[in-house]
């Protein structure tokens, strides 16, 4: 009975950890799919005869992906600062974390 409980708690913990990463992966995949279909639609309408049109298109698709990558990095940093790097925030509030203090003293 006790063994089943511990396995169950481990499963729920791993699900909680994996949930945000899977959500980011899905949103990123949806976004890349949207941009790819959008860019092919532009190519069909323009016919892509001139080189200027091609350059403009590549810049537009690059600008579409920029905010997503920035948002992704912000989400990862906010999640990691809450979970893994709590010792760094503890250092600011007066607590001490051995690995960080060693790196600073050197």
From Swiss-Prot:
Query: Can you tell which superkingdom this protein's organism belongs to?
Result: Eukaryota
Give the Basic and acidic residues compositional bias ranges. 52-63
How is this protein annotated for GO cellular component? mitochondrion
Instruction: Give the subcellular location.
Output: Mitochondrion
Segments of this protein annotated with the region Disordered: 33-64, 87-106
UniProtKB keywords: Mitochondrion
Question: From start to end residue, where is composition biased (Polar residues)?
Answer: 87-99
**What other note does the entry give for this protein?**
A stretch of 270 kb of the mitochondrial genome is duplicated within the centromere of chromosome 2 resulting in the duplication of the gene. The expression of this duplicated gene is not demonstrated.
Protein name, UniProt field: Uncharacterized mitochondrial protein AtMg00890
